[in-house]
Amino acid sequence: MSLPFLNTAPGYDEELRNSVFFERGLHATSICGAVGAAVAVAMLQGQDEAGIASAAGIAASMGAGLLEANRTGGTVKRVHCGWAAHCGVAAADLARHGLTGPPTVLEGRFGFLQAFCGDRAHPDAVVRGLGTDWELPRVVFKPYPCNHFTHAGVDAALRLRAQGLAPADVTAIELGVAKPVLRTIAEPPEAKARPASGYHAAFSGPYTVAAALLGGGLGVSHEDFTDAAARDPRRLALAALVRCVEDERCSASFPHAFPAVVRVTTRTGEELEARVEVNRGGPGNPLSDEEQARKFHDNAVRSLPEERAARTLALPDAQSVEDLTALLTSAGER
């Protein structure tokens, strides 16, 4: 396996990531992420091509993650991203100390792509555009701390709220999304209407639409996903009014976008609709600098003192390497 092939490990084709992995119940973030992290760490360590290949080969035996918790419960998915990072560092260190991995770990008969994707794996697509078509500009910054499939519904609900819709006036809500999205945010319906915890609320279309209509944070914030918030009678009453359905326009855009449409019926019989075609946070609908700064701040102060969070946010204005070093060496202090 060549080094250019390795460098594409974290950047599998979008359709492959969002379709094949999820249909099999696999969490691509924690599986592909382990391999990508191993490559990045090995490169930062200055390992040669063989060492980087071994790091990827080792990580491919470590990466794991199932999506059943999205449907029926459990909070294990919260550790998936951290586990991928852990695997990447461990794999690179093991390779640096002499452990080896199979050189055809990605494309081999019993390799990564065949094991996880079967006949739908297309290794050629992984290297298409290598060196000319960069994925980084297409990175999406999530504005809300909930499943990405819920975001367009959140924004549609926020749009209706901004137009003056009062939650107390709502008698029925229809949330239209792409058909493949329903299994994540709408099924089983009873569990999505009454999430078992704040964590499970983050994967509920009905709950996130209700939270958006009630307002808060950037629209929906961490405070909306506590266990107490998930038990809030106002939120649950509003979520119970939400019916999730397939919308053909949304299905036509999937998986290149995760659009949604929210249709509301009011007590007076008025019917309102808001459709969001392009998710916020990506190149087609980016967050403003102020929104990104606010997101960083709101997350950072959950672990760092306010002063240190502010200093970190001001990092682009650092006058010297010493300023950066001082900030990094004190990052673990509270």
Give residue ranges: language-model regions.
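Terminal-appendage/accessory-domain detector
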Residues: 69, 76-86, 93-334
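Glycine-rich, mobile lid/loop segments that gate access to catalytic sites or pores
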Residues: 1-90, 102-109
